[in-house]
Every structure is written in structure tokens, then in C-alpha cells.
């Protein structure tokens, strides 16, 4: 399964959640609402989740193995960094 598109849909300057991302696989399947989070050890992703009645969060969709998670995370963080740099450079042009 190949990652064929990563779209950074929202970038936040405040708080720990830095972006919301959609990832397309094989031009056939998309997963929305993957979050880019800033943690103590740098950026990581949080897969889309829902809150259970007892207050616990459960992933709706997630990679089954570490290799796939790392591949998805690497692609998302690279695209987030690129989008963030583009946004910052366009803000400088407007000033």
C-alpha cells in the first residue's frame, strides 16, 4: 500500500495540536482527521479517534504494525513541515 497524497488541511499556531491531515492510499482510500501533535520528544501523529461513553478514546482507523505507522508518520510530518514553511514565507511576503 502506497501513500499517494498527504493534505494538510489546517495548521494551528497555538496549542499542542499543530495540524489536521488527510492521507490517501493507492489513490483509492483516504483517512481524514489525522492530527499532528507536538509532544515532549517532537512531533507525532494521532490517528482519528472517538470518545467512548466511559471517557476513553479509541482509534477509528490505525496501522497494524510499527513499520506502517512510521511510514505514515514520516510522510505526514514531512508534508506538515513543508506546508508550515510555505505558510510562513507567504506571511513574510504579505508584511
From Swiss-Prot:
SUPFAM superfamilies linked: SpoVG-like (SSF160537)
HAMAP family (UniProt xref): SpoVG
Protein name: Putative septation protein SpoVG
Gene Ontology process terms (BP): division septum assembly; sporulation resulting in formation of a cellular spore
One Pfam family linked to the record: SpoVG
Domain of life: Bacteria
Lineage start: Bacteria, Bacillati, Bacillota, Clostridia, Eubacteriales
Keyword annotations: Cell cycle, Cell division, Septation
Family statement: Belongs to the SpoVG family.
Source organism of this protein record: Clostridium botulinum (strain Hall / ATCC 3502 / NCTC 13319 / Type A)
Function statement: Could be involved in septation.
InterPro entries in UniProt: SpoVG (IPR007170), SpoVG_sf (IPR036751)
Gene field: spoVG
Amino acid at each position: 500500500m502506497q501513500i499517494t497524497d498527504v493534505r494538510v488541511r489546517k495548521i494551528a499556531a497555538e496549542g499542542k495540536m499543530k495540524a489536521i491531515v488527510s492521507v490517501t492510499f493507492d489513490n483509492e482510500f483516504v483517512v481524514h482527521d489525522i492530527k499532528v501533535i507536538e509532544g515532549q520528544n517532537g512531533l507525532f501523529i494521532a490517528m482519528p479517534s472517538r470518545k467512548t461513553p466511559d471517557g476513553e478514546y479509541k482509534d477509528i482507523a490505525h496501522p497494524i504494525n510499527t513499520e506502517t505507522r512510521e511510514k505514515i508518520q514520516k510522510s505526514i510530518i514531512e508534508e506538515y513541515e513543508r506546508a508550515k514553511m510555505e505558510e510562513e514565507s507567504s506571511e513574510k511576503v504579505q508584511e
